[in-house]
């Protein structure tokens, strides 16, 4: 508990600093100057000559908007200007619906949207920017009783249409923002505002249940830290007051109302199942508080969206789920970054690309500039070779057609590559024995550390350690050194045949790359609580991956000595495993710094079965390497060849019969 408390204090502090300094850091990102803009270029990450950056300054306005129920919401409007004089002709508006304060006061100065160079290119090119604090946050009145509730979403509709109705707006409205600010865009789209014409959601989630409790495993640390962060944001007098409230009377009154808000961790802790009900709001949060539950409505809106995602985000799988399920004109970029990059080099690359791509996107959809963005392949993704040696690839569909699902089976070792509980072998050869198994006494100290993809999603560091220490406390299955590069691009799926001396348990599976020095590098992960293993038809396109409904009625305990199969996907990835390196799968039953696994005494013993009948394995989407392909029936070419032979035989037989009849 002491370690978690220290970690949270560090995260809370780092987030506060980030909120203040982000604008200054992003000023290193810029588009080509007008002198460079002689030729017309529009391609991924590069844009010039299509629209003019004729505004050199901007002016902030702010006020309260009164919602249908009387709640007042604070909003900032940043209008482009030339030499300080506001442009009077109507312009498109791009706005944010934020949980993290629309503006803050630092050393007596208001920091707002105009201080971020993510927004400055848009302001310079003739877009009005706006940001509104969601109810119960910032300088807005009200209390916060849940995440992405129907009240908050209806507010978004009203704000959007108010913006469109103003004399300085030309009727074209878009939305831009990341994380919470990305999700509120999708929720706004579900209400189908007539004037909302384009979205640019950055690192947004799709399925709320999978984020909080992926396959039943409770990642409480993420929710707990976020709750403490937002509680601090809501009750400190740091949010900027609206203009006219210089004595902060209204701001202080709003903050008093915030004290009635409910912490997210208190809402979600008792909600164990996807069909759990929140009695306070009479809602089913996992079904009603997030985009997945409104897929049909979002599709009916037809609003184009550019999805911006990261391979190490906490919501990586959500990105491709949204891409497959939303039917409006769309694009997706999946880069080699986390939710909120802390490395300056990585952050500069990502934010620089966002600045360019968002301008291209809004120029096309809000201003009608035919810059060709919709003629390009809709999918851009990094193929990673280490954290920073990345190559951009494009695709027309996802999963990519070049990736072949290949089974990698678990075998007895040793490999000599790690001092784990079993040091097993990972191979494309299927087991032939009838009794293969590995036993494992659960170690509740296993952890991926305190700088994970989940930590980073709430402002923490992103820096996975050498995974060897964690590997040594779990079951591992490692290949021999690779004879050639192996590219894995897509969604790995784990199939574990397990039994336990306990009635339930959490299982964590990690895909890792072991270098020639023996250092084990984190690639991706997945998790499942054994009692949630029942498979169901998904309510949305789940990309062919196993779907666990996780209703309360679906829960099935374990019976000692009776193996069952756990099938679940890992976060997708695109990673080249270098020649001479090894592919490793590590299995543990706890991640103490990130997930809340009930500890039993004595710790249970897990048996992982790996024989010819119950062959535990992972399915890896392999590009350009030999592997045992998942049995998908006879290959199409073979089927076509057999069909051709049958047709020929029928024709020959028919001709022979006609000759016999003719002779008779």
Where are these regions (language model features)?
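N-terminal cap/lid segment of alpha/beta-hydrolase-fold proteins
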Residues: 46-89, 478, 482-484
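C-terminal, loop-rich substrate-recognition/catalytic regions characterized by aromatic stacking residues
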Residues: 47, 348-659
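Accessory cap/linker subdomain of secreted extracellular hydrolases
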Residues: 48, 112-116, 124, 190-300
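Cap/lid segment of the alpha/beta-hydrolase catalytic domain
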Residues: 84-164, 515-516, 592
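Alpha/beta-hydrolase fold nucleophile elbow
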Residues: 167-179
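Glycine-rich nucleophile elbow surrounding the catalytic serine of serine-hydrolase chemistry
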Residues: 178-187
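Short beta-strand/loop motif that positions the catalytic acidic residue
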Residues: 307-309
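Active-site-adjacent alpha-helix of alpha/beta-hydrolase-fold enzymes
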Residues: 317-331
């Amino acid at each position: 508990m002491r370690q978690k408390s220290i970690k949270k204090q560090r995260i809370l502090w780092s987030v506060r600093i980030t909120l203040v300094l982000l604008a200054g850091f992003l000023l290193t990102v810029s588009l080509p100057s007008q002198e460079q803009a002689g030729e017309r270029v529009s391609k991924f990450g590069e844009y010039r000559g299509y629209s003019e950056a004729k505004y050199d300054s901007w002016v902030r306005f702010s006020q309260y908007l009164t919602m249908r129920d009387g709640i007042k919401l604070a909003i900032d409007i940043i209008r482009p200007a030339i030499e300080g004089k506001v442009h009077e002709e109507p312009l498109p508006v791009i706005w944010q619906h934020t949980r993290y304060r629309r503006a803050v006061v630092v050393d007596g100065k208001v920091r707002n949207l105009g201080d971020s160079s993510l927004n400055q290119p848009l302001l310079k090119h003739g877009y009005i920017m706006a940001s509104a604090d969601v109810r119960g946050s910032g300088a807005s009145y009200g209390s916060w009783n849940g995440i992405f509730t129907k009240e908050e979403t209806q507010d978004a509709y009203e704000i959007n249409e108010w913006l469109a109705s103003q004399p300085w707006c030309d009727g074209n409205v878009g939305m831009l923002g990341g994380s919470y600010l990305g999700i509120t865009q999708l929720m706004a789209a579900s209400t189908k505002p007539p004037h909302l014409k384009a979205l640019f959601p950055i690192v947004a989630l799709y399925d709320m249940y999978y984020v909080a409790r992926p396959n039943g495993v409770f990642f409480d640390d993420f929710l707990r830290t976020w709750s403490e962060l937002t509680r601090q944001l809501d009750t400190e007098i740091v949010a900027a007051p609206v203009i006219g409230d210089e004595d902060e009377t209204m701001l202080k009154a709003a903050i008093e109302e915030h004290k009635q808000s409910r912490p997210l961790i208190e809402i979600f802790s008792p909600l164990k199942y996807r069909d759990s009900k929140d009695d306070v709001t009479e809602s089913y949060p996992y079904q009603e508080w997030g985009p997945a539950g409104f897929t049909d409505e979002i599709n009916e809106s037809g609003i184009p969206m550019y999805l911006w995602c990261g391979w190490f985000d906490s919501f990586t799988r959500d990105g491709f789920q949204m891409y497959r399920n939303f039917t409006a004109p769309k694009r997706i970029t999946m880069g080699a970054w986390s939710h909120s990059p802390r490395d300056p080099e990585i952050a500069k690359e990502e934010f620089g690309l966002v600045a360019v791509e968002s301008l291209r996107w809004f120029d096309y959809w809000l201003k009608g500039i035919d810059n060709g963005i919709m003629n390009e392949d809709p999918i851009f993704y990094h193929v990673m070779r280490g954290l920073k040696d990345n190559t951009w690839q494009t695709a027309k569909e996802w999963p990519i057609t070049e990736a072949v699902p290949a089974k990698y089976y678990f075998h007895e070792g040793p490999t000599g590559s790690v001092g784990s509980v079993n040091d097993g072998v990972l191979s494309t050869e299927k087991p032939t024995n009838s009794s293969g198994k590995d036993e494992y006494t659960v170690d509740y100290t296993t952890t991926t550390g305190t700088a994970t993809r989940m930590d980073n999603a709430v402002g923490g560091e992103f820096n996975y350690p050498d995974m060897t220490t964690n590997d040594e406390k779990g079951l591992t299955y490692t290949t021999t050194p690779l004879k050639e590069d192996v590219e894995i691009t897509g969604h790995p799926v784990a199939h574990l045949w397990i039994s336990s001396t306990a009635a339930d348990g959490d299982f964590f599976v990690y895909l890792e790359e072991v270098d020639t020095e023996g250092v084990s590098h984190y690639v991706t992960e997945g998790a499942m609580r054994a009692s949630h293993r029942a498979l169901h038809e998904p309510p949305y396109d789940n990309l062919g991956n196993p779907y666990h409904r996780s209703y309360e009625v679906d829960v099935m305990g374990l019976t000692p000595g009776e193996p069952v199969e756990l099938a679940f996907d890992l976060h997708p990835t695109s990673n080249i495993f270098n020649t001479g390196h090894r592919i490793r799968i590590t299995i543990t039953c706890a991640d103490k710094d990130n997930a809340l696994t009930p500890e039993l005494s004595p710790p249970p013993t897990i048996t992982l079965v790996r024989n010819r009948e119950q062959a535990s394995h992972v399915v890896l989407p392999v590009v350009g390497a030999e592997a045992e392909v998942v049995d998908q029936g006879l290959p199409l070419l073979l089927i076509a060849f057999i069909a051709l032979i049958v047709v020929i035989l029928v024709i020959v037989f028919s001709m022979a019969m006609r000759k016999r009849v003719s002779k008779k």
